[in-house]
């Protein structure tokens, strides 16, 4: 009996539980949603400002609440709907008497986003870049005030198109060459108290002129050879039996310095009739290089004559006659102390006077840095050398310029004119 009674009580309890559960579900379905409607109207003012809602409005106590991740695409707004978790949240809130402020809520359908204003892109006006003003490189450059006063012509005005003539800084080059003249001077009477005399020097250089002519070397090579000999003899005395060795070795060094194809050492051994060996020439070359400190940049007369001839606008006859007058000086021991620039200017000035009595212009004075008064004593010395060359035993230079290659300039009748005799007589 007790068993039956217990079974009956258990059946009644189950029935009562089912009835209560059914009634509870019916109440949930029939309940009006007025309170939620009012909340939705209030939340409806928010629009689709989803970012204004924070997580702090959702109760965090109950672990039953499940977070849902809502993804909003950039092209369409998804509508947030009530989920099962929200429904269960509501029933739990009612059963546990949670205040309405903490009740879970769902979002209304978002208000359609306002269309973005269509803005017409306007063209941005960029500032125009400033064009740099090109530097004035025209040839109409005003002359310096001093040059205008002196009536000096610009002899390099037509050379700007030829880069080899370096018209932009050719004057600076010649200023530098004049400075080098003072750096490598030749002393007057430097052979005093030496075994070598001025006459021996003249014989050596006259023979070297013949060697130079036979090897068909440049004019610069001859002048540089003489400059090396004079600089060495004034620095280091040389015995008489080594003088010819010094001469051929100096020409070897000058050929290497000036020529494109320099003669070989064997050529100089042959030209001396085997008086010196190849080894002796090479040893003397080392000696000269060390004594002169490998410096062979002393300016030559020929460099200045070319500049002066351009400034004077002289013809080939005057230029060749000036070359002949200059070359007469290389054998003259008494003129070793003269500056190459002064010898070149005096030779050209005398050449102009002998051929057509042309005067020394202001342009020549400007570019040569010598006026006519400064050249008188040098011209007198040159005139005496012209008369001396007619009867001298050292005929290499005179014979060289008597050929048709040099316009037979040494045979000109002007060299026997009264002007030459007058200038030679004034020379002391």
UniProtKB/Swiss-Prot annotation:
SUPFAM superfamilies the record matches: Cyclin-like (SSF47954)
Q: Which Pfam families match?
A: Cyclin_C (PF02984), Cyclin_N (PF00134)
The GO molecular function terms of this record are: cyclin-dependent protein serine/threonine kinase regulator activity
PROSITE patterns noted in UniProt:
CYCLINS (PS00292)
Q: Which UniProt keywords apply?
A: Cell cycle, Cell division, Cyclin, Mitosis
What's an example GO BP annotation here? mitotic cell cycle phase transition
Q: Does the keyword RNA-binding apply?
A: no
The UniProt subunit note reads as follows: Interacts with the CDC2 protein kinase to form a serine/threonine kinase holoenzyme complex also known as maturation promoting factor (MPF). The cyclin subunit imparts substrate specificity to the complex.
Say what the protein does. Answer: Essential for the control of the cell cycle at the G2/M (mitosis) transition.
Protein family per UniProt? Belongs to the cyclin family. Cyclin AB subfamily.
The protein, known as: G2/mitotic-specific cyclin-B
* Originating organism: Spisula solidissima
């Amino acid at each position: 009996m007790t068993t039956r009674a217990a079974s009956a009580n258990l059946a009644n309890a189950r029935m009562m539980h089912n009835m209560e559960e059914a009634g509870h579900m019916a109440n949930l379905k029939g309940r009006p949603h007025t309170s939620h409607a009012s909340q939705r109207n209030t939340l409806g003012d928010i629009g689709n400002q989803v970012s204004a809602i924070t997580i702090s409005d959702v109760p965090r106590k109950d672990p039953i609440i499940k977070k849902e991740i809502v993804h909003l695409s950039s092209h369409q707004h998804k509508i947030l709907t009530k989920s099962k978790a929200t429904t269960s949240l509501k029933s739990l809130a009612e059963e546990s008497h949670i205040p309405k402020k903490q009740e879970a809520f769902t979002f209304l359908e978002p208000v359609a986003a306002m269309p973005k204003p269509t803005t017409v892109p306007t063209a941005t006006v960029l500032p125009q870049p400033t064009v740099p003003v090109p530097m004035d490189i025209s040839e109409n450059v005003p002359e310096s005030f001093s040059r205008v006063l002196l009536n000096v012509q610009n002899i390099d005005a037509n050379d700007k198109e030829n880069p080899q003539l370096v018209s932009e800084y050719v004057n600076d080059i010649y200023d530098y060459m004049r400075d080098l003249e003072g750096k490598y001077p030749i002393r007057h009477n430097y052979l005093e108290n030496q075994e070598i005399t001025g006459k021996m020097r003249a014989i050596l250089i006259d023979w070297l002129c013949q060697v130079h002519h036979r090897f068909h070397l440049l004019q610069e090579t001859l002048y540089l050879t003489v400059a090396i000999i004079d600089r060495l003899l004034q620095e280091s005395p040389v015995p008489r039996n080594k003088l010819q060795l010094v001469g051929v070795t100096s020409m070897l060094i000058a050929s290497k310095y000036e020529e494109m194809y320099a003669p070989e050492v064997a050529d100089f051994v042959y030209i001396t009739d085997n008086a010196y060996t190849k080894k002796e020439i090479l040893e003397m070359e080392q000696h000269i290089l060390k004594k002169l400190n490998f410096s062979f940049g002393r300016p030559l007369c020929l460099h200045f004559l070319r500049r002066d001839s351009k400034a004077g606008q002289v013809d080939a006859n005057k230029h060749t006659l000036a070359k002949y007058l200059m070359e007469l000086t290389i054998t003259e021991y008494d003129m070793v102390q003269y500056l190459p620039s002064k010898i070149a200017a005096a030779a050209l000035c005398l050449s102009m006077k002998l051929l057509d009595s042309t005067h020394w212009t202001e342009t020549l004075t400007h570019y040569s840095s010598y006026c006519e008064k400064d050249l008188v004593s040098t011209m007198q010395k040159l005139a005496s050398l012209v008369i001396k060359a007619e009867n001298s035993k050292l005929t290499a230079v005179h014979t060289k310029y008597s050929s048709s290659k040099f316009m037979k300039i040494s045979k000109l009748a002007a060299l026997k004119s009264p002007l030459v005799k007058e200038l030679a007589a004034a020379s002391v």
